[in-house]
Structure formats: structure tokens, C-alpha cells
Amino acid sequence: MRHFFIALVLAATLISCGNSKNNNSATESDMPAFEQKFPQKSIWVPQDQNDSTEITFSSMEEAEWKLVHNVPHHDFSDAFVQVLLSDSSSMDYPFDSLSSENFCEIFKPVVSDDGNARFIGLKPDAAHQIPHMIVQYKNSGTVRIAKEEYPYENCFYCLTPDTVYTLNTGTSTLYLVWGYAGYTGSGNSYRLMAYELDNVGLHPASVFEGTVDINGGAEDGQSLETEICTNDELYNELVETDFRDLCYFNPKESAIYIRIAASKEADECGCSTRMTNQYQKFVWNGKKFVCGK
């Protein structure tokens, strides 16, 4: 039933938004890497299965923050974030206390004692999801997306780096975060999520036309989603390109391209979607991303 619904949604999308891009690649400038967007000591290190990973941020406010995620045996219930303040004091926050039940929802911000930073993150709700942590420095207004990737007990579920795109709206800055959104039972879901930084702070932004979300995207307009089967013939090719080929942002057009998953008869594994070489285009009109040429 779910795949039938997806097929209907996709069909409606292609009818109303028939402007797809037949292009299987994009230039490096179209797809800015994490390191290119946030080069100043925004360091992430993939971890081994039983080791911890430490990420160090150096801010302009003379504060050093260390985010330590301890995830033994892929049990995220034991994961925590340890914040070391400039006076050598520390604060520990378990993931459970920092996040909502839904991986896609943003949790209530935690403000550090000195008021310099807020910690905003997303909790994984299954073993095959990647936790995210967004660190906002209030004084400087800079935002860094910290991410970690964990090897799975089955290497078939390959790791996916997040990509962060930015768009200046004139009154605020939009952060478009592309990343792995979870295993659906027959395929992997990838989602583009929108956050806005304005004079109020950093918060989820409803900037996508809900009626044109593809493949199960959120109706609230805060994300776009696409899905790929783990046994798709294009799966290995996408692994080689870090899955950036699924979505990219063209700053010259202020447009997003998301690769379309086409529905077909379910195979022996029950998977009924296959990636195509077509992209659905969403153009920024000053207020939202809408289907367009």
C-alpha cells in the first residue's frame, strides 16, 4: 500500500512538475562539500565500530567545544554529547534528553551556561539512521553542522556524508541539509531538510511547496524526500559518489534538483522503486521552493 501511494504521489508530481533535468552529474561548484562550506576547524572523523569520535570546534568567542558521541554496539540509547566550556567545566547531555521521538523533528534548544551556544539536533530512531548535531554560536551568528557516520554490522548499508547548502534570502539565511533519513524496510530514504537562521534564531523552515513533495516528503513543507532500494542497479554507482548525485543546489539559478525515484513492479525483495536519471527542479521564488523551469 505504501509503494502504491508513493507511485500516486510521484505520478501527480510528474504531471504538475514535468520539468525534470536529464543529467546524471553536477559540477563540484554545484555540490559544495561539507568541508568547503565550513572549513574552519569543523572537523569530523568517522569512527570504528567500538571507538568514540571527538569533534572539536573553535569559535570566535574563545570557547572550545568538544562533542563526544559514545555509541557502543550501535546502541544509540547510550549516546551522549559532552560540552567542554572554556573554563574547563563540562555538561553532559544524553541523546534521549536532547531530542524528540521523530528523527525529522527538531528538539527544544539547549542553551549553554555562558549563553554562547545552542545545541540543536536530531535523534535517530533506528539503528540504521545517522544522528545529527547542529551547533549555533549566538554571538557570531555562525552555524556549523556536525555529523558522524557509524559503520553498520551489515556493510551493505553504506555511509552517506551530509551536504549543506546555503541561500541568503535577504532577511535570513536558509540552511538546506541533505542527508540519510533512514531505512524504510525495502530501501533507503534521503531527505533535504530546511532550517532558517534569522533574528529569532535557528529553526525549521517551511520553504517547500507541500503539494509537490516527492516520494513521501513531509506535508509541512520542511523537507523533500526521495528513496532508493538497497538492491537498485544504480546503488553501487551512488555509493561511489557519496550519494551527492541524488540532490544538488545550483546557486546561479537558486534552484534545487532532486533525483526522481520511479515506481515499478515489486521485485523479490518487495522493493518497488528504482532511481532514474531524471531530476525534479524546485526554484526559489523569494518565499518558497516551487516546481519550475
Which residues does each PLM region occupy?
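Start-of-domain marker
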Residues: 22-114
